[in-house]
Structures are given as C-alpha cells and as structure tokens.
C-alpha cells in the first residue's frame, strides 16, 4: 500500500479508493521499457520469422456483409516491409510522426507495423474528423506523412495543401 504523510507527521497508509491513493501510485510509477524495444518486433516480426508460426493467422478481418478473412503473420510482415520501404523512399525517418487515417481493417494493421518497425511514430487519427480537426492535428503533430485509404482520401487531400512539411 502507498504511504502519505499525515498532519501529525505520522506516516499514514493511503487506502485504495482514498483521495491520495491514486496520486501516490502515479508518482511512484515508472515505465520499465528496455533501451532497445520495437513494438513491431514483439507483435509481428518474431512470429513471421518462425516458418510454422508465420503461416498462422495474425489478423482476422470481420466486416458486416462480407466473408471473414484471415491474414497470416507472414502476410502481415511482407506487406509491412513493402510499406516501410515506400515510406523510407519518401524520406520518413526514425522518430518521424506518421498519421494513420484509416478505419479498422487489415491494411491499418499493416500501416502500424510498417511505421513502428522503422522506428517512426504511428499517430491514429479518426476517419470521422472534419477538415479543421484533421488539419489541426496534422500541423500540431508535425506528421510528415498521412496514410489513408479510399474512404479517407478526400478528407486528407482537402487539407494537404496547408501541410507543407508532409511528403
């Protein structure tokens, strides 16, 4: 249990649910992330390298009025590598922010894995944002690229002229 000082300087225990408990826990919390950590390695690449596991489903795509589709770790890895190469050719570098303006689907998983494996930062943006909200977030984040699909292309194109730092 977390401790906090009382008014009489006698240590008191902050009980779960008490006002100071969350604050004490928050102050004491530290992330324990290894100095060299890549989310794409953990979520995709290590599985894709194993011949047997690479053929196993990584993503199950379910959509109304469509047949369910299964995608393997191998497919995810292959497509993510292709997209990473395209992003690199566009000048995206480690630490750059890449906006991902797509609905939840297999291609969105590919986009995140591609961005993460190259050390860039994937920034999710809702496909429901209007032009002002989208433009503000692209500017404020200093995103260098916005990835979109057919459903969000018009919205991204409508603000692209005002985002000169994008590739």
Q: What is each model feature region?
A:
Residues 38, 70, 147:
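Short aromatic/basic micro-patch
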């Amino acid at each position: 249990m977390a401790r906090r000082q009382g008014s009489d300087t006698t240590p008191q225990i902050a009980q779960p649910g008490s006002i100071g408990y969350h604050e004490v826990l928050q102050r004491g919390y530290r992330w324990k992330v290894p100095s060299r950590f890549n989310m794409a390695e953990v979520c995709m690449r290590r599985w894709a390298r194993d011949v047997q596991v690479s053929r196993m489903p990584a993503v199950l795509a379910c959509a109304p009025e469509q047949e369910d589709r299964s995608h393997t770790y191998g497919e995810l890895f292959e497509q993510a590598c292709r997209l990473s190469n395209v992003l690199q050719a566009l000048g995206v570098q480690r630490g750059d922010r890449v906006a991902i303006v797509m609905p939840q689907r297999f291609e969105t998983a590919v986009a995140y894995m591609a961005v993460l494996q190259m050390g860039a930062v994937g920034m999710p943006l809702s496909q429901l944002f209007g032009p002002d909200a989208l433009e503000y977030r692209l500017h404020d984040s200093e995103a260098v690229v916005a990835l979109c699909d057919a459903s969000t292309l018009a919205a991204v194109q409508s603000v692209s002229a005002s985002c000169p730092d994008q590739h």
